[in-house]
Amino acid sequence: MDREELLRTITTSHRELAQLAERISDDRLRDPAMGDWKGKDVLAHLAWWHDQSVLVIEGLRAGRQPYDETDPANTTDGFNERVHREHLDDRPDVTRVAFNQSFERLQAAIRPLTDDDLFGADRWPWLGGEALVEMLLWDTSRHYAAHLEHLAPLAQNART
């Protein structure tokens, strides 16, 4: 895989989920999708992870630590809980737009990266020996696959 293939992979995955989201009415996006999360909350969550990836890329490229990993609030669960709380009142149309616009920002952040930036396991010490591409795949295509099962039923079953 190189940068162009990465961009094709995540863009294809994003397009598929964005098309699914377009088939879900705003009313259905207000329905439960995952525990106490509504469909719109899942889209807001995915958008936040896109933007988080952008912040990590920007921090790494600037030579700074993107965030303090030792802070107990900066865990995956901590981030997810905070994002859910902060976006509870977002309208479905807002989360749909955020999902798409945040992905555009992520694509723009990836484009100037070299293959070494993306695939070099030792390129960014802050990532603890993991290549940046792994984080990007988990924050995009792999993440979409994990939430597809939560959103797909909202597109299939019309509210009566």
Language-model-derived ranges and their functions:
Residues 3-6, 68-69, 107-110:
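A broad, low-specificity signal for short, low-complexity segments enriched in glycine/proline
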Residues 14-22, 50-58, 100-114, 145-148, ...:
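Structural signal for well-ordered, non-membrane alpha-helices
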Residues 8, 29-78, 118-160:
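Short, contiguous alpha-helical
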Residues 24-26:
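Extracellular-facing binding/remodeling surfaces
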Residues 76-119:
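Acidic/histidine-rich alpha-helical segments that form the ligand environment
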Residues 2, 39, 80-95, 126-134:
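Acidic/His metal-coordination segments adjacent to aromatic residues that form catalytic metal sites
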Residues 1-16:
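Extreme N-terminal tail/first-helix region
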Residues 2, 48, 52, 90-91, ...:
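Alpha-helical structural elements of signaling/regulatory helical domains
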